[in-house]
């Protein structure tokens, strides 16, 4: 594949400007208070490194999906305030991206100062990978660093097109991006065995390609969450009103067959917590998967399944987990996900957690510090596991024949 250009390889000149593409797409409540700042904290090492090299830093990110230009609820101003608090320093903020205000703010930026531009997606050119928009961003700085792993699977202007305006000595990946790519590479190419993959979440469709790519590489595969019911249907169980992707029943069966052929042990739920509706007030009961009542739906794994999955994890040396075991947002259906988090955290394995929902489960379970690595990217993390090349990584990779001797 070649080698990823690293921020450490750049010979920065004191007083020059660095443009860092970050992923500050953080959740906020209705009052625009940031409810989880993991992504902000994850960007700090690269920002600090560039400041220590004597540069001034321009930060850029998107937040949410604004439809038509500026929308106050998608402004990055709360991010600037949180970053200032986390870094214990002033973070300048401009309510603009490529207009006069932004150009002026960049021009006036002094050595060792940090400026955050407003939401890149307020400009249509960002998601269109528009070279003119990218050129305007590139004109701000002498160097370009991408530390936004969460958007590397998207060919957007600040991720892909912008790199065409920098040579290999002036562009690179930040520490977070390199860490993310290395963890994914080690998982799929050099896992310490036994290697157990845990797949959950609502849909098979979102993880189908990842499951297919992982199957020849893992020793065990654990399937939970809403997606498990498509597998249960595939082997002939009645699943009531549980989530079902009818068009993927055959694919689910193929995965089970392929697992058997490869000698991979595949674990699916043996019991479930079921209810007639997805509600905290709903009546619920624990049944075996053979006894799901008509009109009821499975919303969490049951205690027998928790015990089975814990046993499957007991000898693991590498664990990859993507997707909760149930509707964890509702307390009464969160037990399976939280117990799974505890089991993975207590293992002696290298543990890699992917996906925003899964990271939320781990945080809620109080296990964040016990996991080896929690990925900041959902879609990007899955695509790497699927074996795909990410546009944002490709443009920062020197092919072997381009490497300097």
Curated annotation (Swiss-Prot):
SUPFAM superfamilies: Phosphoglycerate kinase (SSF53748). ATP binds at residues 207, 298, 329, 355-358. It is an enzyme of class 2 (transferase). One of its GO terms (cellular component) is cytosol. Gene3D superfamilies: Phosphoglycerate kinase, N-terminal domain. GO terms for molecular function: ADP binding; ATP binding; phosphoglycerate kinase activity. Pathway: Carbohydrate degradation; glycolysis; pyruvate from D-glyceraldehyde 3-phosphate: step 2/5. Substrate binds at residues 23-25, 39, 62-65, 121, 154. Its EC number is 2.7.2.3. It is found in: Cytoplasm. Keywords: ATP-binding, Cytoplasm, Glycolysis, Kinase, Nucleotide-binding, Transferase. It catalyses: (2R)-3-phosphoglycerate + ATP = (2R)-3-phospho-glyceroyl phosphate + ADP. GO terms for biological process: gluconeogenesis; glycolytic process. PROSITE patterns: PGLYCERATE_KINASE. It holds the Pfam family PGK. Monomer. PANTHER family: PHOSPHOGLYCERATE KINASE, PHOSPHOGLYCERATE KINASE 1, CHLOROPLASTIC-RELATED. Belongs to the phosphoglycerate kinase family. This is Phosphoglycerate kinase. The gene is pgk.
């Amino acid at each position: 594949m070649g080698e990823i250009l690293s921020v450490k390889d750049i010979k920065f000149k004191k007083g020059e400007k660095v443009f860092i593409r970050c992923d500050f797409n953080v959740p906020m409540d209705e009052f625009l208070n940031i409810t989880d700042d993991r992504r902000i904290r994850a960007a700090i090492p690269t920002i600090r490194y560039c400041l220590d090299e004597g540069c001034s830093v321009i930060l850029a990110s998107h937040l949410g999906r604004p439809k038509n230009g500026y929308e106050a609820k998608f402004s990055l101003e709360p991010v600037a305030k949180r970053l200032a608090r986390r870094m214990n320093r002033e973070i300048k903020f401009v309510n603009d991206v490529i207009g006069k205000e932004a150009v002026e703010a960049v021009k006036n930026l002094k050595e060792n100062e940090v400026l955050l531009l407003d939401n890149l997606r307020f400009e249509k050119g960002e998601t269109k990978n528009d070279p003119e928009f990218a050129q305007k961003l590139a004109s701000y700085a002498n160097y370009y660093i991408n530390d936004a792993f969460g958007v590397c699977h998207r060919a957007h202007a600040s991720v892909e097109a912008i790199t065409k305006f920098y040579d290999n000595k002036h562009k690179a990946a930040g520490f977070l991006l390199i860490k993310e790519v290395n963890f994914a590479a080690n998982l799929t190419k050099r896992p310490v065995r036994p290697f157990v993959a845990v797949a959950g979440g609502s849909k098979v469709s979102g993880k189908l390609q990842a499951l297919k790519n992982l199957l020849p590489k893992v020793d065990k595969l654990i399937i939970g969450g809403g997606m498990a019911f498509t597998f249960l249907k595939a082997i002939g169980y009645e699943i009531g009103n549980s989530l079902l992707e009818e068009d993927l029943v055959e694919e689910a069966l193929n995965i089970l067959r392929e697992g058997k052929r490869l000698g991979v042990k595949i674990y699916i739920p043996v019991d479930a917590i079921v209810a007639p509706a997805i509600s905290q007030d709903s009546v619920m009961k624990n049944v075996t998967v053979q006894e799901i009542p008509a009109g009821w739906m499975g919303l969490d794994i049951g205690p027998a399944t928790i015990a089975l999955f814990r046993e499957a994890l007991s000898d693991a040396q590498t664990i990859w987990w993507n997707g909760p075991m149930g509707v964890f947002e509702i307390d009464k259906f969160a037990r399976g996900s939280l117990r799974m988090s505890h089991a993975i955290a207590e293992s002696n394995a290298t543990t890699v957690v992917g996906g925003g929902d899964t990271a939320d489960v781990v945080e809620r379970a109080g296990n964040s510090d016990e996991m080896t690595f929690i990925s900041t990217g959902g879609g990007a993390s899955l695509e790497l596991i699927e074996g795909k090349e990410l546009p944002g990584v490709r443009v920062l990779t020197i092919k072997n024949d381009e490497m300097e001797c």
